[in-house]
Amino acid sequence: MADDNGGGGDDYVSEAVRPEGDTHTREEGLSKSRDRDREKDKDKERHRDRDRDRGRDRDRGRDRDLDKDRDRDKDRDRHQRHHRDKREHRDRPDDHDRHRSRDSERRRDRERDGHRRHRSRSRSRSRGRDDHRSRSHSKSKRVSGFDLGPTAQSVLPQFPTIPTPSQLPGSSIPGMFPNMLPFADGQINPLVMQPQAMTQQATRHARRVYVGGLPPSANEQSVAIYFNQVMAAIGGNTAGPGDAVLNVYINHDKKFAFVEMRSVEEASNAMALDGILFEGAPVKVRRPTDYNPSLAAALGPSQPSSNLNLAAVGLTPGSAGGLEGPDRIFVGGLPYYFTEAQVRELLESFGPLRGFDLVKDRETGNSKGYAFCVYQDLNVTDIACAALNGIKMGDKTLTVRRANQGSAQPRPEQENILLQAQQQVQLQKLVYQVGALPTKVVCLTQVVTADELKDDEEYEDIMEDMRLEAGKYGNLVKVVIPRPHPSGEPVSGVGKVFLEYADVDGSTKAKTAMHGRKFGGNPVVAVFYPENKFADEDYDAAA
């Protein structure tokens, strides 16, 4: 028993007396162990955080995939609805779509036609060529601009027409019955014109005046103010106090206006203002084309008042009236190539003119083959009509008569004057028959314009047309079509076409066949041209 206790005591003593350094080492080891445990715990926590982040990322990815799937489903549904609508639209006969399609087709046709007219006048000649015509087309398939001959209406002189009462503006007014105008043609029942509105409408053609040659700065207000002032200055306001002008319409492109007066008498007084200066430019004052003297005679005075003070506005008394009145002469059947100066010279063989107007096409500026004139000495009116009527001028026959009534016979005391005038006309006729004697050269006018010749492609088309058509009638030696100079310098003969043949037989056939044919909407004028002038390249000789 003593051994057991003794042994146990030794152990206790040995533990109690263990060195202090061993204790410190053990505590340090325990501390490190705890630190390692803490680091492990932190690592585990970090792993859990990363796992949670990865989980959230996976959830967001799944959400994005779901959104994409939903978008794809929506796109697929829209695509299917679109195709279903298109199929239904095709299958359903919708009237609106048909109308819209027809409108589109008509619009495309108009655009095609406008493009053709702009690019090539050959389309207006009904030549049947495509817009981009190939040069390789055979001649047998090519349609010439000369295929159609002139209509009878196009070669006859245009005479003024007198409308019937049914054609009067007032006759178509609502509330008016046909039996309200039981009078003969050219007469008006004044009882029908009682209401002011109907009177205004029925007299409008006699209350309007044409004013041409306006400056570019002119407008409706300035024209109205000016004519109100000058009408008051000359004493032309015969309808009472106030402005004479009711309305003004201006065509700025062509520089003319229609001025509507408040009364027929004031419109006639305004005719005395022909040649007056408006903003420094002399203007023409004329009756409009719908004016008819026979109908206007029942509505009021057709001549300006003799009491007008024209000197107040710088006009010479005695020039009033211009081309109006019963002594106005119609001159028809003039050769198209006659210039204004040539026609004037012919008419003035009977005396000085008070008024003269060679009627021209507004678009081309070419003569329409007729004119109007009034002589200062009205006594020579019948003499001139009798002397000039029926005279041959080239291949034309003149028709000369009073414009507003049938031809009157000259009085006995005028017979000697008439005989002398006829002899003078016969001499002048020889002067104006240039182109009557056959030559090898034919000159065509009213075929082309300067603008058309500026375009190279159009020029070649016209040249080819001329060669093909002119070659049908004989041995064609040369075709000359003068063109405008790019610098703007004057070039002789622009607007004419010259055809030179090997002999007179060919040129005669060509002149006969081509004269009066339609080319570009105009009747072609074909005359012989002096060979010496053609050889000298003088293309401005009268032809």
From Swiss-Prot:
Signal peptide: none annotated. Residues 1-10 have a biased composition (Gly residues). It is found in: Nucleus. GO terms for molecular function: poly-pyrimidine tract binding; pre-mRNA 3'-splice site binding. Residues 115-126 have a biased composition (Basic residues). One of its GO terms (biological process) is spliceosomal complex assembly. Gene3D superfamilies: 3.30.70.330. Residues 17-78, 88-114 have a biased composition (Basic and acidic residues). Residues 207-290, 327-405, 446-532 form the RRM domain. The gene is U2AF65B. Residues 1-171 are annotated as: Disordered. N-terminal RS domain has a very strong bias in favor of D over S. Belongs to the splicing factor SR family. InterPro entries: Nucleotide-bd_a/b_plait_sf (IPR012677), RBD_domain_sf (IPR035979), RRM_dom (IPR000504), U2AF_lg (IPR006529). This is Splicing factor U2af large subunit B. Keywords: mRNA processing, mRNA splicing, Nucleus, Repeat, RNA-binding. GO terms for cellular component: commitment complex; nuclear speck; U2-type prespliceosome; U2AF complex. The keyword Lipoprotein does not apply. Necessary for the splicing of pre-mRNA.
